Amino acid sequence: MHLVMAQVLAEKGCDGFVFRGDDGLDEITLDGTTSVLSIGREEISSDRIDAKDFGLANAPIEAIVGGDASENARITLSIFAGERGAPRDAVLLNAAAAIAAFEGDLEADIKTRMSAGLLRAVDAVDSGKASTLLNKWAALTQEISAS
């Protein structure tokens, strides 16, 4: 299915990525390799990445399973508070992909683009910028719902 999605995006002239964890996860996985289809200039190229390619540890899916909204919020806040581990690595790696897709150099390979994105994702979390933005969104949401 991810190839069909990539073909549609290429036909529409979009640039970006479609990921599928080789363990069946619908995002970048820490549990082994991830198949990546890179779409650019109406062409599709295929690659595989592994968390280890970016200095991150592999981890089983069970290590990153969330829960209900409250549990997922708790996990997010703990990551933003500096907690290390598989959930943080999964968030950083998927954020790196989003950054690479949005701002990456189309001439560079996937690993180069994602490495640059990972540096920015780590900075956003470790500097407190991600937490600050989350707090702004929360305040805005509360303001809107109170109106």
Regions found by a protein language model. Give the residues of each.
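Glycine-rich anion-binding loops and their surrounding alpha/beta cores
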Residues: M1-S147
